[in-house]
Regions:
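Nucleotide-activated donor-binding/catalytic signature segment of Leloir-type glycosyltransferases, i.e.
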Residues: 259, 266-292
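A short, well-ordered alpha-helix in the C-terminal region of glycosyltransferases
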Residues: 364, 371-387
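Membrane-proximal helix-turn-helix segments that form the acceptor-binding/catalytic region
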Residues: 22, 94, 98, 115-118, ...
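N-terminal subdomain of nucleotide-sugar transferases
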Residues: 1-62, 247, 409-413
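Nucleotide-sugar-dependent
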Residues: 235, 287-294, 299-323, 330-339
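Carbohydrate-associated surface elements
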Residues: 178, 199
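Conserved donor-binding/catalytic core segment of Leloir-type glycosyltransferases
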Residues: 4, 218-235, 241-244, 257
Length: 415
């Protein structure tokens, strides 16, 4: 089977689960794989050294052919620039993709931006190629809830566009049962939708000796509550700082460790510095291997999201990473993520955006014995290996691709 991976990000850009490792695994399983994407610019919005914007270029990464097309690089708060980035990649991929890449049996659309279905629609129209829509963000909510695009009428236009992409897709992959229910409520036939949970970057998992040896960030000897990921509006990390402030005098040995970066980073640091908080540590974004060493010294891994309908439907990727790490997990989130973690047996939940509830939960976890927390972590790791691991997820993805590619071509969509 010849698979085209249509994606807004790809290596060397970080944190893309269905990137190069995914492509290599598909090749290992006997499939021909090609990638159609833009030029690497995430997360800073600047094109990486060694690349320059041009109409198109080809390269081979670990044996996988990658075709990159011209786009406007942006990943900041500007709605105009972000929109230009989304539309430019979709437009040039729609124009240049068909003549540049080998004709696929199926197109996998990593959505991301809903606009990226545009080139897949072109392949469908020109060659009858079916596409599988992998819904990672629910549009239009993902851009309207955050305030990225809040102009009158934008939500209606994006909603209509999204419905068209769902109708024309041969199959739709979603990351949670919450997303599945949402699409069904919007008229997508249940038989078209498959739930495939995301896996995590397993290179970032702590090794057996990662908690030993050098400790460059001074984590030893403290009870570390570690948050790793994006510092954005949806993560609502200001509330985590408030929780840390509430317990600093009660338990000065407890420290909140933030690993990563994002648009809220400066504001968070300013808030912590303004209150003189000593129980907060910010660590820059780390390579997967380095992150594993930090995770090994964590006592609790934190998942925190703003409390809104979009957050309740989805499952942030750090949920899987936290479970796989074999540590107790604290989720300040409701909905699909909390339901998934509850099945693992080693996670606590509390109300999101409630610093007092978060502080109480952290104090409760800190009061448990080491053996109790170790048991929680072991249950989480076992659940990840059996239900969420990379090999399991790729197998489920491949089955969806094969079903999409062999189904008789007929009018798609509708009931």
């Amino acid at each position: 089977m010849r698979v085209l991976l249509l994606t807004p990000l790809f290596q060397p850009e970080p944190n893309h689960l269905k990137g190069l490792a995914f492509a290599r695994e598909l090749v290992r399983r006997g499939h021909d794989v090609e990638v159609l994407t833009g030029f690497p610019h995430y997360p800073a919005g600047k094109v990486y050294p060694g690349y320059r914007i041009r109409p198109w270029m080809r390269e081979i990464l670990d044996g996988v052919p990658v075709t990159r097309v011209m786009m406007y690089p942006s990943h900041d708060r500007s709605a105009v620039r972000r929109t230009a980035g989304y539309l430019s990649l979709a437009g040039t991929a729609a124009l240049l993709g068909p003549p540049l890449v080998a004709r696929p049996d199926v197109v996998h659309v990593y959505q991301g931006p809903a606009t990226l279905a545009w080139p897949a629609m072109v392949f469908r129209m020109m060659f009858g190629t079916p596409y599988v829509l992998d819904v990672q963000d629910m549009w239009p909510e993902s851009v309207t809830v955050t305030g990225m695009l809040s102009l009158p009428g934008v939500s209606a236009v994006l909603g209509a566009w999204s419905k068209a992409t769902y109708r024309l897709a041969r199959k739709i992959i979603v990351l949670s049962n919450g997303y599945k229910k949402c699409l069904e409520a919007r008229g997508v036939p249940e038989k078209k939708i498959e739930v495939v949970y995301n896996w995590c970057d397993e290179r970032s998992l702590p090794g057996e000796t990662d908690g030993e040896g050098s400790d460059p960030f001074g984590l030893a000897g403290r009870f570390n509550v570690v948050y790793s990921g994006n510092f954005g509006a949806l993560q609502a990390l200001g509330g985590v700082l408030d929780a840390a402030f509430l317990i600093e005098e009660k338990r000065p040995d407890i420290r909140f460790v933030f690993v990563g970066d994002g648009v809220e980073e400066s504001a968070l640091k300013k808030k912590a510095d303004g209150r003189g908080q000593k129980n907060v540590l910010f660590i820059p974004r780390q390579a997967p291997e380095s992150l594993g060493r930090i995770t090994a010294r964590a006592d609790v891994l934190l998942v925190h999201l703003k409390d809104d309908p979009l957050a309740r439907m989805g499952i942030p990727q750090k949920t899987q990473a936290s479970l796989a790490a074999g540590k107790p997990v604290l989720l300040a989130i409701r909905g699909s993520a909390a339901e998934l973690a509850a099945r693992a047996g080693g996670a606590w939940t509390c109300r999101p955006e409630d610093p007092a509830a978060l502080a109480e939960a952290v104090l409760g976890l800190a009061s448990l014995s080491w053996n109790e927390r170790e048991t929680m972590g072991r249950r989480n790791a076992e659940f990840y290996r059996k239900e969420l691991a990379f090999s399991i997820g790729v197998g489920r993805m491949t089955a969806v691709f094969e079903e999409a590619a062999v189904r008789p071509r007929r009018k798609e969509g509708g009931r």
